[in-house]
């Protein structure tokens, strides 16, 4: 039997300033994984979270 797909999906959030910022504490890009409800949040998610590479709170956008 095929499993029914749930409403919640796992997404990846990526720091928007790590790609362009060169004055970082350490090299790399900050990524968080979380889940979202497909029915309630249909668009791309944007959350302000702490980036350890930039050493500040930045906007993290959904990439996949």
From Swiss-Prot:
GO terms for cellular component: cytoplasm; ribonucleoprotein complex; ribosome. InterPro entries: Ribosomal_bL33, Ribosomal_bL33_CS, Ribosomal_bL33_sf, Ribosomal_zn-bd. GO terms for biological process: translation. It comes from the Bacteria. Keywords: Ribonucleoprotein, Ribosomal protein. GO terms for molecular function: structural constituent of ribosome. SUPFAM superfamilies: Zn-binding ribosomal proteins (SSF57829). Belongs to the bacterial ribosomal protein bL33 family. NCBIfam families: PRK00504.1, PRK00595.1, rpmG_bact. This is Large ribosomal subunit protein bL33. It comes from Rippkaea orientalis (strain PCC 8801 / RF-1). The gene is rpmG.
């Amino acid at each position: 039997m095929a499993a029914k797909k749930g409403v919640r999906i796992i997404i990846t959030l990526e720091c928007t300033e790590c790609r362009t910022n060169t004055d970082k504490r350490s090299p790399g890009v900050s990524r968080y994984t979380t889940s979202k409800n497909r029915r309630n949040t249909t668009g791309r998610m944007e959350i302000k979270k702490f980036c350890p590479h930039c050493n500040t709170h930045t906007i993290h956008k959904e990439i996949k």
